[in-house]
Amino acid sequence: KMSDYVLFKNLDNKYLTFKEALEENKEKHENTIFYTNDPVQQSQYVNMFKDQGIDAIILKDNIDQPFISQLEQKNENVKFVRIDADLNDSFTEEISEDELKDATEKLTETFKKALNRDQLDVKVQKIKDEKVSSMITVSEESRRMQDMMKMYGMSGMDPAMFGGSGETLVLNANNALVKYILANPEG
């Protein structure tokens, strides 16, 4: 009952109710409320959201994670997603299967070798903002598991025990630097 009266602060410092936050971007993402827990640290994502005209709310207190889980349980069709969890279709352009497969294979090999991380997940997408060369996304499920582990004092545990870190390196196929690396994998 009280969820109708709870106010969320959005990226423009406006306060919205739960229903208003859902309604705000209904055309762009049905039944999804995007949020940030640190607008400064996630400023690249915040700027991308603003550029695409997509709103997000700010949830930076410890009580927010259990609260949004409770809201998701009470409203089964509603999902809260942190802005760095994944790039939805509003931020990307279509890419052909052949081009995607070729670029992903080449760039995955190059970055795994350069970063010396065999377990690195690499994803290639055409992000609309050509200035962005790469981003790290963390799946919502993995991030929530990590938050829960921190809350219960288990932060020293390895997230790989629960199916990996959920981190993905997203490379922008529209970026000049990524195009250069693709054309010159040896440098």
Regions from the language model: what does each represent?
Residues 1-187:
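Conserved GHKL (Bergerat-fold) ATPase module
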